[in-house]
Swiss-Prot record:
InterPro entries attached to this UniProt entry: Leucine_aapep/pepB (IPR011356), Macro_dom-like (IPR043472), Peptidase_M17_C (IPR000819), Peptidase_M17_leu_NH2_pept (IPR023042), Peptidase_M17_N (IPR008283)
Co-factor remark: Binds 2 manganese ions per subunit.
Catalytic residue positions: 273, 347
HAMAP family associated with the record: Cytosol_peptidase_M17
Upper taxonomic lineage: Bacteria, Pseudomonadati, Pseudomonadota, Alphaproteobacteria, Rickettsiales
Single Gene Ontology MF annotation: metalloaminopeptidase activity
Reactions performed catalytically: Release of an N-terminal amino acid, Xaa-|-Yaa-, in which Xaa is preferably Leu, but may be other amino acids including Pro although not Arg or Lys, and Yaa may be Pro. Amino acid amides and methyl esters are also readily hydrolyzed, but rates on arylamides are exceedingly low; Release of an N-terminal amino acid, preferentially leucine, but not glutamic or aspartic acids
Function recorded in the entry: Presumably involved in the processing and regular turnover of intracellular proteins. Catalyzes the removal of unsubstituted N-terminal amino acids from various peptides.
Gene3D superfamilies: Leucine Aminopeptidase, subunit E, domain 1, Zn peptidases
Metal-binding is among the record's keywords: yes
Binding-site residues, Mn(2+) 1: 266, 343, 345
Gene behind this protein: pepA
Name by which UniProt lists this protein: Probable cytosol aminopeptidase
Main location: cytoplasm
Keywords, ordered alphabetically: Aminopeptidase, Cytoplasm, Hydrolase, Manganese, Metal-binding, Protease
Organism: Wolbachia pipientis wMel
C-alpha cells in the first residue's frame, strides 16, 4: 500500500523575497553589462569601489554569466555577475542569470545574499527559484559537500517594490506548478503508478478548486477503450483515466483541452526495450505531468478560461497476459488497430484519451503531450526543440509563438495523406507503426493520433527530447524539466482567456 505522504511536493526550503534597496546585507550580488564601467548600485552599495577593484584585480568584462568577487569595507562581500551585451538582455536571460546566481552562491557556500539587478527583479528571483528545485527525499544522509542556499533577497527601488512583489508572486505560483510536474516525473515507479498517481492528482488539485474525476478499469471497459486497456493488460497495476476540470469562464464558453500520456513505467512490453537506459522509462509519464502542472497553474492564477485536462495512466509491463505483437484491438472510436510493436504504446493510450476528450467535451482545441518517439530526438537532438504536429495553422503558430516567448521552443513537422496511407493495416483499420524502412517515425506516430481526431483543432507535442535534461540548465537541475507548463500557461494567457 502506498502512502500519500511520500508524495509531498518538493517546494524548496529556500526563501526568496523582494525588498527595497538597503546596504544591510553581508553578501550582495550586482550585475554589470559587457564593456560597461558603471555598476548599478542603487546609490548605496559602493559601486565605484567595485569597478576599481575589478580593474585592479581582474580581467572581468561582463560577459554573460561571468562572476567576480571582491571584498569591501565593513566586511561586505560583493559578487559581480556579467549580464552580457545590453542590447541582447531579455526576460529569458533575466531568468538564466537568476539561476546562475543561485548556483554561484551554492558553489561559494553562501547561505544568504541580496541581489540587485535593476528592472529585472521578478524574473531574476524566478530564475533562482526554478533552479533551486531538489528531489532528495529518499536520501537518508545529507551530502555535506553541498551547501544549501537558504535565502535570497532581490532588491528594488522603493517605487518598484509593489509591482515587483506582485509579478514575482505570479511567477512563483507558476513555478510551484512546474515543481509539481518535476516531482511527479522524478518519483520511482514503485511509488508512482496509475492508482497512486491518480489519487495524488486528486489530492493536490482539489486544493485549488479543480474538479477531478477518475475512471477505473471497469468504466473504461464500459466505454470500450480497448487501445488503452490493451497496453495495461500485462501489468498488475490497473489503468486510470483522470479528468481535470477548471471552470474559469462562463458556461457558454467552449473549453480548451490538454491530453497527456501517462505511462508510469515502460518496459516496452513483449517488444522489450534494451536493459541499458530502461531506468529512464519512469519519465514516460512526463506528458501527463505537464498537463497536471498546467491545470494547476491555470487554477492557481484563476485563469478566465474553461479548461479540461485528461491524463491516461497505465504501466506497460511484461507478463503472461501482456499484449502481443500482431494483436488487434478495438479503440473507443470503433476503429481497429493492429499492434505490431508493443513498445509503440503511448499512441495507443492517447488514441482513446483523445477520442474520449473530443467526444465528451467538444473542446475549442486539443493539445496532447507525450514522450512519444525516440525519432524526435534523432531529428531535433536533445533539449533544444520539441516536435509539433497539428491540423490547424493558427493553433500551431500560436504554440510556436508562446514557446519562443518562454524559451520552450517547438519545431513543426509536416503531415499529409501520403504519410497517412503508410500506416494502413492489411487486416485492421490502422497499424500502430509504419512498415520497416518507411522512416519518419515521429510523423507516423502523429498521423496515427490524427486518426482519432475528427474535425477538432488539434496539436501534438512530442516532448521525448525535452522532458528531462541529463546535465541541467540555468533554471533546472539535472533531471525532470517540467517542459510545457510555462509554454501552455503562456498560450492560454496570451490567446484564450476571456476579456474583462
Amino acid at each position: 500500500m502506498y502512502s500519500l505522504q511520500l508524495f509531498a511536493t518538493e517546494i524548496p526550503a529556500m526563501k526568496i523575497t523582494i525588498s527595497k534597496i538597503s546596504p544591510d546585507f553581508k553578501t550582495i550580488v550586482m550585475g554589470l553589462f559587457e564593456d560597461n564601467e558603471t555598476v548599478n548600485d542603487g546609490g548605496v552599495l559602493q559601486g565605484k569601489q567595485v569597478i576599481d577593484n575589478i580593474k585592479q584585480f581582474s580581467d572581468f568584462n561582463g560577459s554573460f554569466g561571468e562572476f567576480f568577487s571582491t571584498a569591501l569595507p565593513e566586511e561586505k562581500n560583493v559578487i559581480v555577475v556579467g549580464l552580457g551585451k545590453k542590447d541582447e538582455w531579455n526576460e529569458n536571460k533575466e531568468l538564466n542569470i537568476g539561476g546562475k546566481i543561485y548556483c554561484e552562491l551554492s558553489r561559494l557556500k553562501i547561505k544568504k545574499a541580496a541581489v540587485l539587478i535593476e528592472g529585472s527583479a521578478a524574473n531574476v528571483a524566478y530564475g533562482a527559484f526554478l533552479r533551486s528545485f531538489k528531489f532528495d527525499k529518499y536520501k537518508t544522509k545529507k551530502d555535506e559537500k553541498i551547501t544549501e542556499v537558504e535565502e535570497i533577497t532581490v532588491l528594488v527601488k522603493d517605487e518598484q517594490l509593489s509591482n515587483a512583489e506582485r509579478s514575482f508572486e505570479h511567477l512563483r505560483q507558476e513555478g510551484e506548478s512546474i515543481f509539481l510536474a518535476r516531482s511527479f516525473i522524478t518519483e520511482p515507479p514503485n511509488i508512482l503508478y496509475p492508482e497512486s498517481y491518480a489519487d495524488h492528482i486528486k489530492k493536490e488539485l482539489t486544493k485549488l478548486g479543480l474538479e477531478i474525476e477518475v475512471l477505473d478499469k471497469k468504466q473504461m471497459e464500459e466505454k470500450k477503450m480497448g487501445a488503452l486497456l490493451g497496453v495495461a493488460q500485462g501489468s498488475s497495476k490497473e489503468p486510470k483515466l483522470v479528468v481535470i476540470k477548471w471552470n474559469g469562464a462562463s458556461k457558454e464558453q467552449k473549453p480548451i483541452a490538454f491530453v497527456g500520456k501517462g505511462i508510469t513505467f515502460d518496459t516496452g512490453g513483449v517488444s522489450l526495450k534494451p536493459s541499458r537506459g530502461m531506468e529512464s522509462m519512469k519519465y514516460d509519464m512526463a506528458g501527463s505531468a505537464t498537463v497536471v502542472g498546467v491545470m494547476h497553474a491555470l487554477a492557481g492564477r484563476k485563469a478566465k478560461v474553461n479548461a479540461i485536462g485528461v491524463v491516461a495512466l497505465a504501466e506497460n509491463a511484461v507478463g503472461g497476459n501482456a499484449q502481443r505483437p500482431s494483436d488487434v484491438v478495438t479503440s473507443m472510436s470503433g476503429q481497429t488497430i493492429e499492434v505490431l510493436n508493443t513498445d509503440a504504446e503511448g499512441r495507443l493510450i492517447l488514441a482513446d484519451a483523445l477520442w474520449y476528450t473530443q467526444d465528451r467535451f467538444s473542446p475549442k482545441f486539443m493539445i496532447d503531450l507525450a514522450t512519444l518517439t525516440g525519432a524526435i530526438v534523432v531529428a531535433l537532438g536533445n533539449n533544444e526543440y520539441a516536435g509539433l504536429f497539428s491540423n490547424n495553422d493558427e493553433l500551431a503558430n500560436r504554440l510556436i509563438d508562446a514557446g519562443n516567448e518562454v524559451n520552450e521552443k517547438l519545431w513543426r513537422f509536416p503531415m499529409n495523406e501520403t504519410y497517412d496511407k503508410i500506416i494502413d493495416s492489411p487486416i485492421a483499420d490502422v497499424q500502430n507503426i509504419a512498415p520497416a524502412g518507411s522512416g519518419g517515425d515521429s510523423i507516423m506516430a502523429a498521423q496515427f493520433l490524427q486518426r482519432f481526431v475528427n474535425e477538432t483543432c488539434w496539436a501534438h507535442l512530442d516532448i521525448a527530447g525535452t522532458a528531462w535534461h541529463e546535465k541541467g540548465t540555468d533554471i533546472c537541475p539535472r533531471g525532470a524539466v517540467g517542459f510545457g507548463v510555462r509554454l501552455l500557461n503562456k498560450l492560454v494567457e496570451k490567446y484564450y482567456e476571456a476579456n474583462d
